[in-house]
Amino acid sequence: AALLEGLQATQQGLRALLHGLGLAPDVHGQPAWPFAHRVAVEMLVVDAGHARRVLLSLLCVGVALLALAVSVASRRGRKPLWWLAAALVVFAPWPHRHLLLTPAVATSLHQSPTGFTAQGIVHGQAVYQQHCVRCHGASANGEGPDAARLAMWPPNLNGALLWKRLDGELFWRVRHGMQGRNGAQTMPGFGITQLTDAQVWEVLDYLQAHAAGQMLRESGTWDRPVRLPDVAVLCRQGRQH
């Protein structure tokens, strides 16, 4: 978890730096990720072996940089330190590129600004029922009345799928749609004239809350982490929190 959070924070920091330099303009209200790829932090959770390789490689690079720094400050014994740094880089257990990097979009690192409030979830439910239920189904299981007519059957949104994607990339898919490998559209996008950015975030909040509830109903456990909705609580003393 610490490795995942550290790598994600590093990417967020790089984006903030580029935004400050004017190299990452605002897109949908937040700084854009300006690169075609990003570090696939979600793979660190899925593949423990890959996570170990990433951690060990980072340690090797860190020790190699330390050896080079010491060699610069030292007048003696520079060559052994250089050889040590080179050996660490050469023999580091580098992770496979296709596991380390994944294609990115401008909103990949965007984070929901809604606060996951109860009101926002209710608003998102209304948006879903108006714009999404025909394809994804009333229970979000991908079996809506129009699903069979699509080029690709809609996914079941009641499982762990939403936790395997970054919020910003889910936002992009709702806003801009999806295409199959052959370029054919598999899901239409909803432009700014159809849904506001706030509505897109709210429907994603609703889907996550709904999926968590469905998994709890089926398994009796919270299989995936979900935030507690921000709600006002009225205590017996009449105080609101």
Language-model regions: role of each:
Residues 29-71:
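Membrane-embedded alpha-helical segments of integral membrane proteins
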Residues 121-133, 165-169, 194-197:
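Sequence context surrounding c-type heme c attachment/ligation sites in exported
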Residues 148-155, 175-201, 210:
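Axial heme c-ligation environment in periplasmic c-type cytochrome domains
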Residues 125, 137, 141-172:
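Gly/Gly-Pro-rich "capping" loops immediately C-terminal to redox-active cysteine motifs
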Residues 104-127:
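Electrostatic cytochrome c docking/interface patches
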Residues 124-139, 187, 203-207:
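The canonical Cys-X-X-Cys-His
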Residues 101-112, 216-240:
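N-terminal "domain-start" segment that seeds a small globular fold
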Residues 77-102, 128:
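Internal/C-terminal transmembrane anchor helices
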